[in-house]
Regions:
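Active-site-adjacent elements of ketosynthase-type condensing enzymes
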Residues: 47, 51-57, 136, 215-242, ...
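Short, well-ordered amphipathic alpha-helical segments that serve as non-catalytic structural scaffolds
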Residues: 81-92, 165, 192, 265, ...
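ACP-dependent fatty acid/polyketide chain-elongation machinery
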Residues: 1-70, 92, 267-279, 374-388, ...
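Conserved catalytic cysteine-centered active-site region
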Residues: 2-7, 41-89, 122, 132-195, ...
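Glycine-/small-residue-rich "gating" segment that lines the acyl/pantetheine channel
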Residues: 146-153, 191-194, 198, 215-271, ...
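Phosphate/pyrophosphate-binding loops at sites that engage ATP/ADP/AMP, CoA/4′-phosphopantetheine
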Residues: 88-119, 269-276, 305-322, 344-348
């Protein structure tokens, strides 16, 4: 495609997830609607001396699902990414790697199923991670210290590389249009999906596997975040610890897992008769340039990202019916985000159903934008906004009409949902998705 051609429409044709709420998309969505928390008290011996002794580990251990020979060569973050990508790829109707069709859109088995995209050079992989293979780095350092250099795994370097998840996902589907890694702290997964959207809009690819992954529930991270006063210390109440918008919120709960979507050019999806979840309209980006670990207090960067999304797409503020908020359960960030959006949307903010799904999943850092995009896409598909749990006493600065402890129906017709992700370093990402009447 000529890069000077008009921007193409992008749609979502597959979703995949492995999260603290379930080992796949269906179980995760069911738990979100039921208002279940994936947080738990850590039982490992090393947790006893930490200031934070709670987390939201993945519901399904990836090593129990992946073949042993593969699992041993992947860091936990890459394991999550591969599992989520496999589910999303199959959900999109693909049954093989790119290029295995020999140029045909028919699987050739008489069912009419789609085998895979015909040209691997039109398929991309973009996976974000905030930290990368830290579990491998720490465990292999222990091996070096305790058993000597000859016992260090020869797979250590490829396992700990931050680009490893994207590379392995790319090899899973034979993606050759480009394999990219976004490392923007807690905005990584969302920015990766935005990058994938742009790859298709500008003609670089027809199909992109995009998302985010993280696996950092280890003593060093828990101690470091705890000492930063960023995490909840409600060690006696793990499931009630993540409480966005509640007056008593005191920080996030660390989670792990991955969320992946299949992005596809609309004409490519139509040609193969693919089922479409929604349109992936675009992204807005900005940077705070304020502090490496503190949010800019006025929310100007958040507002700028939303303004960019509105300026570069055909989204109208009146269409926006749902927001999956970044809302990590920190005292400052939750309210700043809502105020920034209100500045841009004005009265249209009043009909936005806000969901803070981190109240259930915990905060997956670089994986957050991935699983929250999956939740946003499913909210549009089912026209239902998930609840926000653990609000005992709503913050006085939060409009009570915006959030609910129960699932809420979304209106019919053409509606837009936003997914916000912000990261240390001042990274701001706002993704926009649209479902049309009849979808």
């Amino acid at each position: 495609m000529n890069l000077n051609s008009p921007l193409r429409t992008v749609v979502v044709t597959g979703v995949g997830a492995t999260t603290p709420l379930g080992g796949d998309t269906a179980s995760t969505w069911e738990s979100l609607l039921a208002g279940r928390s994936g947080a738990t008290a850590l039982q490992q011996d090393w947790a006893a001396e930490l200031p934070v002794r709670i987390a939201a580990p993945a519901a399904v251990d990836p090593t129990s699902v992946l073949p042993g020979h593969l699992a041993r060569r992947l860091d936990r973050a890459a394991q999550f990414a591969v599992l989520a990508a496999r589910e999303a790829w199959a959900d999109a109707g693909f049954t093989g790697k790119a290029g295995e069709t020999g140029g045909s859109f028919d699987a050739g088995d008489g069912t009419g199923r789609i085998s895979a995209p015909a040209d691997p050079y039109r398929v991309g992989s973009v996976v974000g991670t905030g930290v990368g293979g830290v579990t491998t780095l720490l465990s292999q350092y222990d091996v070096l210290r305790e058993r000597g250099s000859r016992k260090v795994s020869p797979y250590t370097v490829p396992m700990l590389m931050p680009n490893s998840p994207a590379a392995h996902v790319g090899m899973e589907v034979d993606a050759r249009a480009g394999v990219h890694t976004v490392v923007s702290a807690c905005a990584s997964g969302a920015e990766a999906i935005g990058y994938g959207i742009d790859m298709i809009r500008t003609g670089r690819a027809d199909v992109v596997v995009a998302g985010g992954t993280e696996a950092v529930i280890v003593p060093l991270n828990l101690a470091a975040f705890g000492n930063m006063m960023a995490m909840s210390k409600r060690n006696d109440d793990p499931q009630g610890a993540s409480r966005p918008y509640d007056k008593g919120r005191d920080g996030f709960v660390l989670g792990e897992g991955a969320g992946v979507v299949i992005l596809e050019a609309a004409e490519h999806a139509a040609r193969r008769g693919a089922a479409v979840y929604c349109e992936a309209v675009g992204q807005g980006l900005s940077a705070d340039s304020y502090h490496i670990a503190q949010p800019e207090p006025t929310g100007r960067g958040i507002a700028a990202a939303l303004e960019q999304l509105l300026a570069t797409t055909d989204i109208r503020p009146s269409e926006i019916a749902h927001l999956n908020a970044h809302a990590t359960s920190t005292p400052q960030g939750d309210v700043t985000e809502l105020k920034a959006l209100e500045k841009v949307l004005g009265d249209d903010m009043g009909h936005v159903a806000v969901s803070a799904t981190k109240s259930m999943t915990g905060h997956l850092l670089g994986g957050a934008g991935g699983i929250e995009t999956v939740a946003t896409v499913l909210a549009l598909r089912h026209r239902t906004a998930p609840p926000t749990i653990n609000i005992t006493e709503l913050d006085d600065e939060v409009d009570p009409s915006l959030v609910s402890s129960r699932p809420r129906p979304l209106p019919g017709g053409n509606i837009v949902a936003l997914n916000n992700s912000f990261g240390f370093g001042g990274h701001n990402v706002v993704l926009g998705f649209r479902v049309t009447d009849g979808q």
